[in-house]
């Protein structure tokens, strides 16, 4: 009864090896996962997604190796590399049924991805937090010409200063390499790489009430997260949060 579903086995096995007095740890294995993205998750990722887009499940198998290094000065360094096989991964493309070319839909394809990831984290006296994330990925699709809107390289930096329990300042720059997409005529286009630099300050009045101010895209760059949707060059936001 109903649609016929394919039965799948998704294996997972991970081995972790501590070495050198636990300063270095090596982890390797296979991790499989099944995912059915919600409309809310997709809407946050792409606010211009059509509510009529067909959402399907997907699964991945990740074969990886990871090395952790923790220094005596409280610096965490993590290097990970691997190979992912994706079944029915989703990608965004313009919805041909949208007359103004201002909405997106989902297309699906199987993928094979080679990737490398570097993470650094450092904390000084619980006042300064510094973290860096670098990701390189080479995504090969089966039927699609390219992996739409998927960059080959991403970099994220976070610097946060906690003056005390109430006040903190954050500096958050990021970089993303160019991506490929389809225009309304079905032709391949490239969206240029982007640099986004943000500043934020937060003040906790008490455990329930806090105030914030954010200054986004201070690099004053006009970039496109999605086709036909340019960013604002500078965005200032201020407000308050209250937890009930």
Model-derived features: positions:
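Exposed, low-structure sequence patches enriched in small/polar residues
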Residues: 2-244
């Amino acid at each position: 009864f109903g649609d016929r579903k394919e039965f799948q086995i998704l294996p997972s096995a991970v081995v972790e090896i501590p070495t050198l007095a636990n300063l270095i740890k090596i982890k390797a294995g296979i991790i499989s996962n099944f995912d059915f993205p919600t409309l809310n998750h997709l809407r946050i990722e792409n606010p211009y997604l059509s509510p009529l887009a067909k959402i399907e499940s997907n699964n991945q198998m990740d074969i990886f190796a990871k090395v952790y290094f923790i220094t005596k000065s409280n610096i965490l360094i993590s290097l990970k590399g691997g190979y992912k096989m994706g079944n029915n991964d989703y990608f965004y493309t313009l919805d041909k049924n949208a007359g103004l070319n201002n909405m997106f839909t989902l297309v699906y394809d199987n993928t094979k991805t080679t990737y490398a990831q570097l993470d650094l984290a450092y904390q000084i006296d619980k006042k300064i937090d510094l973290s860096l994330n670098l990701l390189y990925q080479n995504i090969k699709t089966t039927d699609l010409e390219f992996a739409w809107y998927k960059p080959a390289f991403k970099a994220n930096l976070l610097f946060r200063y906690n003056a005390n329990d109430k006040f903190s300042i954050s500096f958050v720059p990021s970089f993303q390499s160019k991506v490929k997409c389809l225009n309304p005529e079905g032709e391949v286009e490239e969206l240029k790489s982007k640099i986004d630099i943000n500043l934020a300050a937060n003040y906790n009045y008490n455990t329930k009430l806090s105030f914030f101010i954010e200054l986004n895209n201070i690099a004053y760059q006009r970039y496109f997260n999605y086709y036909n949707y340019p960013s604002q060059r500078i965005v200032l936001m201020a407000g308050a949060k209250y937890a009930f």
